[in-house]
Amino acid sequence: MLLSLALIFLCGMILGKIFSLLKLPSLLGLIITGIVLGPYCLNLLDNSILSISADLRELALIIILTRAGLNLDIEDLKKVGRPAILMCFVPASFEIIGMILIAPKLFDISLLDAALMGSVVAAVSPAVLVPKMLKLIDEKYGTNKSIPQLLMAGASVDDIFVIVLFTSFTSLVKGGNISYLDFVKIPTSIIFGLLLGIIIGFILSKFFTKFHIRDSAKVVIILSISFILVSIETSISNLFGGVIGISGLLAVMSIGAYLKKSKEELSKRLSLKYSKLWVAAEIILFVLVGAAVNINYAFNAGVLGIVLIFAVLIFRMLGVLLSLIKTKLNKKERIFSMIAYCPKATVQAAIGSIPLSLGFASGEIILVIAVLAILITAPLGAFAIEVSYKKLLEHE
């Protein structure tokens, strides 16, 4: 395991730096590192690392979402209002509709299989989007209209919506029925996730005021609580018979947002600590995403797979455009939002192989498209954000 970690960090840093020098997204270098080191290429990563890959990726997500919360001003979100809610489900819904319309014509699959494929591909990646938006907040680009905050908030809920749809479509393909209780879990996951985060944020705020603790120790406390919140998601859902859900990741983000509101100076210091943790977490996250990608599948889809990815992205962009109707955003800012809301990585790496493991006839092509979505949209989206934000957003 130690050798595998050394390879992940050293090779990831070197290749990431090379790509940065070539003016390409460093995360592309990290994903390629994972593909090369992973089980489908050189197979240099120990099974002990691969077996906990999902947990390590979740750990990295916890770090970046906590940092997002620590930089998320609630007042900014209040100003945005309606579009923030629409961005949580409209773009993903449009992308799934696009998949249902186009995929059966290109790959001779059923409408239901196309819907399942759409639910795998539709989730935006907070791991790609959030660090870029935090950079925009630091540099004061788009902050006068709360654009980074809008996109970060939408991305955190978008995943919940898509995963519930994925569960429902999986049940239908298996020959079962859609449980309407699954859809009740969407609002309850959001509401109870936010409430739990606010309550814990309030308790931590009082605790940190009463007891003098080093900032490093505060980070350890917050991280530990975050791990517990994410771990008990399934247990809480089962406790209430699957009717009530709770989003641990949304609760984690809410803790950070509450600390930002109640103790702004502390939140700035903690954000700095988390940004240092993200240096290592980012490498682990994207290298392991790459390791989960079977590059051989990507070649199986050919040109049609690439055409499909770009076609459904157009549908997604139309969904973003619709969500931003009657806002104060100008044409350039809307274009930026459409571009920024495209990258995919973490959810696709996590659920892309599930239909194949369940023995679905469409399982292989769904995995192929999930792999392509990661390889195309994660680096391309990160690159597009990087080269366009100074041209399309106003500097405050």
Q: Language-model segments: which ranges?
A:
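Transmembrane alpha-helices that form the ion-translocation and gating core
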Residues: 74-142, 295-393
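Membrane-interface alpha-helices at helix entry/exit sites of multi-pass transporters
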Residues: 140-157, 161, 180-184, 269, ...
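C-terminal ends of transmembrane helices
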Residues: 11-22, 66-79, 129-142, 200-212, ...
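Hydrophobic transmembrane alpha-helical segments of multi-pass transport and channel proteins
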Residues: 14-18, 124, 160, 190-199, ...
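Structural signature of hydrophobic alpha-helical transmembrane segments
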Residues: 1-8, 49-66, 111-126, 185-197, ...
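Core mid-bundle transmembrane helix pairs that form the ion/substrate translocation pathway
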Residues: 5-17, 157, 163, 167-269, ...
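Hydrophobic transmembrane alpha-helices of secondary-active transporters
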Residues: 31-38, 53-80, 96, 169-174, ...
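Hydrophobic alpha-helical transmembrane segments in multi-pass integral membrane proteins
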Residues: 97-102, 160-168, 227-244, 285-298, ...
